[in-house]
């Protein structure tokens, strides 16, 4: 093998390795993911890398038990949760008010969950949590992780308009 051919081979191999490592780094890059809830619009958006990839209808807190505005973090994810209410415990199943999934937030007692009352979706009907159709919360649950940011907006801000395309 002559020296000139070896040098060309080495350069080609180096370029290939650089391209492959850049592609791998891009693939391994964590997705910047957050959940945005517009309380007045009763909608939840899953935002990845700055754009809404999915928008869901939700139920929000009723007038006497409003959903809190603010920034939170996902701190727990529970499949088939048990509901502990005043003097009552409801195991996982169709009559469980939390539905099939619970995404617990850093604000104690608040979360995003399914429902045993799908007719409440789109209304101010909860005790402050965000209720979703059961199939929707299962889909969201599969895509979010502990540590993801969650933002509840009580007003239609520029950010809400951007996320929800208003």
Task: Describe these PLM feature segments.
Residues 2-13:
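Bacterial N-terminal signal peptides that target proteins for export
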Residues 15-25:
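Hydrophobic h-region of N-terminal signal peptides that target proteins for export
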Residues 2, 26-32, 66-69, 81-82, ...:
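Exported/periplasmic cell-wall-interacting domains
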Residues 24-71, 76, 92, 100-103:
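Cell wall/extracellular polymer interaction/catalysis modules
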Residues 11, 41, 58, 74, ...:
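Intrinsically disordered, low-complexity regions enriched in small/polar residues
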